[in-house]
Amino acid sequence: MSIISPQDVKKLREETNAGFGDCKKALSAAGGDFELAKKKLREMGIASAEKRLDRDAKEGRVFSYSNNIHAGLLLVSCETDFVALNHNFVNFGNSLIKELVESGRNSLATSQELELKNLAATIKENIQVKKIFITEIQSNEFVKIYLHGEQSKIGVLVKLKVDDFSKTEDKMLQDFAMDLALHVAALAPIYLRNDDVCPNYIKEQEEIFAKQLELSGKSESIVKGIVAGKIKKHLAEISLLEQGFVKNDKLTVREMLEEVSKAISSKIEIVEFKYLRIG
């Protein structure tokens, strides 16, 4: 039986980032063979990672990347905020979103799934890729990305289209695009425009509001008017274009788009947005 020295264990730890006990166990099982021990660690790690999948992973962070052809956001969860700051965790997320954006993929390849399991084994937490959003940047489009705070617990991507693409160099447009991303981070709209809201959802809300007014004693026509007003207000809360702009709530986002379009002499359109949040 091979004698496993502390120096051997230290060397394996430095090469794999695995724990002392796991390294010692792997070396013993491999008879002191370093390459075999690494394989044993991977096998042990994947098994233990799968056992951790039922543990809550309510922390994490959002990662982003853009290469002017595609852009994307990635939400990776973990169990503790301490791990969300771990350099191995951060490096994994940054590398993964770059690979996904550069390939245009919105799902993990087998090799990437294995990397995820190995990371979970090394850090010893339930780590999961929760959400992937990749978008293609078409002609006359550009994106603005905002990550909130040191731990990037909120990530926003806004894609805009400009009739005159040379205007994307305009500071007013760039500032407005960033303000839009900040707006989405602050108010978390669900839809871009009212037309995107499911008609069945609107009907359900109308029924709820009408039910609330059943005992009001008001006439049917007045109730209909009140319900219509409540629906309009509700849609303004969940639709980006109808929300009061975060830096000037006297104007809606739609009206701000028109104002900036006039100022730079080029029509601006919000093509889409994405909001990701930990928790």
Curated annotation (Swiss-Prot):
Domain of life: Bacteria
One GO CC term on file: cytoplasm
Compartment(s): Cytoplasm
Keywords attached to this entry: Cytoplasm, Elongation factor, Protein biosynthesis
MF term (GO), any: translation elongation factor activity
PROSITE patterns: EF_TS_1 (PS01126), EF_TS_2 (PS01127)
Pfam families documented for this protein: EF_TS
Disulfide partners: none
Main localization, broad class: cytoplasm
Region (Involved in Mg(2+) ion dislocation from EF-Tu): 80-83
Alphabetical list of InterPro entries matching this protein: EF-Ts_dimer_sf, Transl_elong_EFTs/EF1B, Transl_elong_EFTs/EF1B_dimer, Transl_elong_Ts_CS, UBA-like_sf
HAMAP family in alphabetical order: EF_Ts (MF_00050)
Family statement drawn from the similarity comment of this UniProt entry: Belongs to the EF-Ts family.
Function, in words: Associates with the EF-Tu.GDP complex and induces the exchange of GDP to GTP. It remains bound to the aminoacyl-tRNA.EF-Tu.GTP complex up to the GTP hydrolysis stage on the ribosome.
Name of protein: Elongation factor Ts
Organism: Borreliella afzelii (strain PKo) (Borrelia afzelii)
Origin organism lineage: Bacteria, Pseudomonadati, Spirochaetota, Spirochaetia, Spirochaetales
